[in-house]
Amino acid sequence: MIDKEFLTFSEKPRELPTVALRGLVVFPDMFIHFEVGREKSINALKEAMDGGQEVFLVAQRDVSVDDPDYDELYDIGVIAKVKQLIRMPGKNTNIRVAVEGIARARLIGGVAGKNSKCLRSLIVPVSELPVAEELRDYSRALVRHAKELFADYVEVASQMPVDIVTGVMQKSEPGELADYVAG
């Protein structure tokens, strides 16, 4: 769980269609493909495509739950832009989706509709508080050290893609670097 002291609300609450993710976490600035099979998730993605293409992606606490409710979702997720939906061939109804994470958001609650075909969440985008000036030098040193450790890893790792190495080395903020490496 993210410590609430390190986050600040950056906008007013808004409502978005929601996809509960199993065993997957999406971060801001991350581009990812994954498959969706649950009817509510497919409907949420279709609703997003019919609207502004934005969807709230949030991990569910227990991956064995087939139809999670809001209390079974984590508090922090990501607002993402749906880039592409592709129906998978075969008998299953799975859809392959491509999304790009935009910003972190806090789940405030669910928006229940009588005939709701998908999860809809009331969310508020959040941003990290800036690093205090007295910790700035320490923060820079940690980023520098993390990059040095990554460079050491690249030397022993086989077939490390150049774009990943470049991406890590271009990050200067601790949060951005952590999101990039985690993603």
Residue ranges and their predicted role:
Residues M1-G183:
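N-terminal low-complexity, acidic/polar interaction/targeting segments
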